Every structure is written in C-alpha cells, then in structure tokens.
C-alpha cells in the first residue's frame, strides 16, 4: 500500500466534491476519520454487483460536510435503497447539529431525485454521551439494524513498536513468539495468489456460518484497489512445506488500515499462525507510514477474545440510522430484505455446530470478522 501522507492544498467546494472523484478522494484521505466505504474506489468495487453511487456535499459556514451514497435497486421494486457507510465526512471528523441538518437536506433532495425509499447511514462517530443520537433523531433519522460492525478496536500506529507490544495481552505476545518457533513465516503477495486467499477465507466463513461471496468479487476488489495502493495481501506460510496456512486482505484509506478479510487453516491454527500474521500486518503497516489500524469489529465471543489480545482502544459507534424518503418504498424494501434474510438463514441452517454457538473453534483459527452484506 502507498504512503498515506497527503500534501496540503486549498479546500474544495461542495460542487467539486460531488462531481470530481479526485477531489473527493483527496478530501476523504485528508479527513480525520477516512473510511474505504466512502471512497470512489469502493464504489467501483461495488459496481459489478449492481450498486451505483452518488455524492452529496454541503457548505456549513467555513466547513464542508459530504457523503457518498451507494444505491441498490432490487428487481421488481421501483424504489432503491441508499447506503451511507462510515460517513458523512468532515475534515475534522466532527458532526454538529448544523452539519447534520445540512447533509440531511441534501440527502432528501438527492434521494427523491434517485427515487430511493430510504437512506441508511452508519456514521464514523462514537456513541459517547448520546448527543449525536439526539441530534439525528431531531433531524428525522430513526435507529436501524447495523450493517457494519457497531464496535471495533483501533490501534494507534503512531506509537513505537515497544509500546504496541506492551499494549498486547501477555498470552498474545506468547502466541506470536510460539508461532515463530513452530515454523511460520509471513510473506506479502500479489493478485496471482487470490485463489489461495479465497480457498482459506471461504472455508473460514463457511465454518462461521457466513455466506461466502464469489471468488470474482475478491479478485475484482484486488484489481481495483491494489493499483490505487489501497490493498495489501499477506500470507502465513509453513516454513517446512511452504503451504499457505493463514491469510489477511488489508484495505486502506488515507492514514487508516482496515483488517477486513482473512482466514486460517487447521494447520495454521495448530501453529498459531493467525497471531504472527496479525502482528506482522500491524508492524508492516506502521513501517509504511499508516497511523491507525482498525481491527474491524468485535462481533462474536471467540473473535473478540482473539482481537482484543492485540490491545487498542475500543470504539462503540453511534450505530445505524434510516432516513425515510418514501414511506411506501421503504416498506416494500424492508419486506424484501426480510425475505432474503430468512432464505439466508435457511440455506446455512446446518453450518453452525450446536455445541459451538459462539464460533469459538472458528475464532481460535483466527478468522477475520465476517463481512457485512452491503459494505464489501
């Protein structure tokens, strides 16, 4: 991945952010909380799966607030749904009442123009004392089921390596060292090894009860993000056989790296390869100049225990919120979504081991957080 540093320059206009990909990407990368879900590159990743994107921006005094909205239109429904992941975006990461009202007005106007039933938003904001939630409610947003993880761990890569190690749990440090003794090495890879990544990742997802995506989806993701310096693929290999026994696909935006997808084989679990792999990912991202490492969610008991071993600050987000554009359209879209979820649960009804309800075996093997349905 490329160095996240950006040169300072004159501020963009709202019109430029809405219509110019380069201006938007620069604004996003330089913001206090850049997320790949808000990048034009991510919109390109989503396009083959039927998603389209538009952006809105508004000037609030001497500040600008902007957002990228991904749009999906289910077959047979004259309304689409909009998804605003980890936004809106502001230079300082703050979102006050004026900014919320301004972006809400722009989303209403654009939502009607794009014939949306509703827009679901998951701000990159902490729940805190509830102030943001109150302001969103006053602006006619309503709480909704979250799509992305509603809590995560953020590692501060501005610390030196000794401080990062000190912040890890003792058993995690021991597992990292043991993995090295058991004969594990970490290597960077390119897109030619995506089939190996896919085999490990999908096996992990299936064991965790998550519907795997197609290999083409991940290959497209790599092909679109890697040339922009937004993706990095790592493998843990057994030093004696050369076999790939664990993998991670990292995605970056601005100064932040997200630990997005991964998996571990049974042999990788035996050698604790997931511990060494994650530690090396952290070290290499720090060396590349990134300042924040997002472990991307704490969704299940076993996964939470594994991830929290690496330290970091727990962040609890304000959650997901819906803005209704068309009441009829939203009702139809909600009914369709409920039907698809029932089918998904039926299809994967036999995947979970009843004796392992929290996925502890999968977590022990070091699987990455299951991806959200819409954000990837």
Where are these regions (language model features)?
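Residues at the N-termini of beta-strands
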Residues: 81, 116-118, 256, 292
């Amino acid at each position: 991945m490329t160095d996240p540093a950006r040169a300072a320059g004159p501020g963009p206009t709202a019109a430029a952010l809405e219509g110019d990909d380069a201006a938007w990407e620069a604004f996003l990368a330089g913001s206090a909380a850049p997320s790949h879900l808000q990048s034009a590159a991510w919109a390109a990743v989503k396009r083959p799966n039927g998603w389209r994107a538009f952006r809105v921006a508004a000037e609030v005094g001497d500040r600008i607030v902007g957002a990228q909205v991904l749009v999906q239109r289910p077959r047979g429904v004259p309304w689409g749904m909009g998804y605003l992941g980890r936004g809106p975006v502001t230079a300082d990461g703050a979102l006050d009442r004026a900014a919320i009202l301004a972006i809400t007005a722009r989303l209403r106007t654009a939502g009607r123009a794009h014939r949306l039933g509703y827009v679901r938003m998951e701000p990159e904001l902490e729940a805190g004392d509830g102030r943001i939630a109150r302001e969103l409610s006053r602006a006619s947003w309503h709480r909704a089921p979250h799509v992305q993880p509603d809590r995560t761990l953020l590692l501060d890569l501005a610390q030196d390596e000794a401080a990062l190690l000190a912040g890890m749990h003792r058993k995690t440090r021991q597992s990292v060292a043991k993995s090295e003794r058991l004969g594990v090495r970490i290597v960077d890879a390119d897109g030619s090894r995506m089939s190996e990544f896919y085999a490990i990742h999908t096996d992990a997802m299936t064991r965790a009860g998550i519907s795997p995506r197609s290999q083409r989806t991940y290959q497209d993701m790599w092909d679109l993000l890697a040339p922009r310096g937004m993706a990095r693929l790592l493998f843990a290999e057994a030093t004696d056989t050369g076999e790939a026994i664990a993998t991670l696909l990292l995605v970056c935006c601005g100064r932040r790296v997200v630990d997005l997808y991964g998996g571990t084989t049974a042999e990788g679990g035996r050698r604790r390869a997931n511990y060494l792999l994650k530690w090396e990912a952290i070290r290499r991202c720090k060396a590349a100049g990134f300042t924040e490492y997002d472990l991307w969610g704490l969704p299940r008991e076993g996964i939470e225990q594994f991830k929290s071993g690496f330290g970091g600050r727990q962040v609890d987000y304000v959650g997901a919120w819906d803005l209704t554009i068309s009441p009829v359209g939203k009702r139809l879209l909600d009914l369709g979504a409920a039907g698809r979820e029932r089918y998904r649960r039926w299809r994967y009804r036999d995947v979970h081991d009843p004796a392992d309800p929290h996925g502890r075996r999968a977590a022990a093997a070091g699987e990455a957080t299951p991806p959200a349905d819409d954000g990837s």
